[in-house]
Regions:
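Active-site helix of classical SDR
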Residues: 122, 158
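Conserved glycine-rich cofactor-binding loop
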Residues: 8, 15-17
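C-terminal helical subdomain
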Residues: 184-186, 200-251
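Substrate-binding pocket helix/loop in short-chain dehydrogenase/reductase
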Residues: 98-99, 106-111
């Protein structure tokens, strides 16, 4: 097995869309990659595409469904000995339906992927690499992680979790003096397989549905801008589709007088 001494970037959900383009973008910068997704054939195709122009890179592909309980932990254990520097939690999907009509099996799987797997990976990556120079955790949220979108309440709730969790983690890391940085990327409508999955549709036309939208390559470019910046949030405006690099958006009760006193013994 080829294993380099450089630092690796892990990208989940790398078989299509933003994850696919982000993998190519990081490879373009000379980063070795560990790519995870359900569809191993697409990962292998991506690996071949990258190596055709960057043959010196180490591109590790792992076919895994991280929405299945236990698979996220197993995947992490398989790669934890690699010298990791960047982890991008991109895997996720959405759902368009009224809460009272939504398919609960689909919602359960969505929460396992959007929330549970992301939290497991974030926690373990921070635990093992928080003092690694240059380490970054980038969690993919959504513009719907800062604004509630009609007919997408459950999806937005899952992305509000991603946004608030990552913003809070970013504060924890900074206040603890850790070298790692945590960031949130929140794109607006992007032409990917998201539309078909969210609507349980065989075909989905972004031109008809939205009129204005990002390409996956544009979104990956914005993600790189966030990676290069010292800001916590990279947010695409849902109306103008302009990209903003900002500080954390949620209120943080760090100095609230009614916070739990951490110096007290808790029984």
């Amino acid at each position: 097995m080829k294993r380099h001494t450089g630092r690796y970037t892990v990208i989940t959900g790398a078989s299509s869309g933003i994850g696919y383009e982000t993998a190519k973008a990081f490879a373009g910068r000379g980063s070795d990659l560990i790519l995870a997704a359900r569809r191993g054939d697409r990962l292998e195709a991506l690996r071949r595409e990258i190596l055709s122009s960057r043959p010196a890179l180490d591109i590790v592909v792992k076919a895994v469904d991280i929405s299945v309980p236990g698979n996220a932990l197993q995947f992490y254990e398989e790669i934890r000995e690699y010298p990791l520097q960047t982890w991008i939690n991109n895997a996720g999907f959405g759902n368009y339906d009224a809460v009272g009509h939504q398919n609960l099996d689909k919602i359960r799987q969505m929460l396992r992927l959007n929330v549970e797997a992301l939290t497991i990976f974030s926690s373990l990556f921070v635990r093992d690499f928080q003092d690694t120079e240059g380490a970054q955790l980038i969690n993919i949220s959504s513009a719907g992680g800062y604004t509630i979108v009609p007919a997408a309440v459950s999806y937005c709730a899952s992305k509000f979790y991603v946004s608030s969790f990552t913003e809070g983690l970013a504060r924890e890391l900074k206040e603890s003096g850790c070298r790692m940085r945590a960031k949130v990327f929140a794109p607006a409508a992007t032409e990917t397989e998201f539309g078909k999955v969210a609507n349980d549709a065989v075909e989905y036309d972004y031109e008809t549905a939205f009129g204005t939208y990002l390409t996956s390559a544009q979104a990956a470019g914005f993600l790189l801008e966030l990676y290069d910046s010292d800001k916590v949030v990279g947010l695409v405006d849902r109306e103008s589709f302009s990209f903003q690099l900002t500080e954390a958006q949620f209120h943080y009760a760090g100095d609230a007088k009614h916070n739990q006193n951490s110096s007290r013994e808790i029984n």
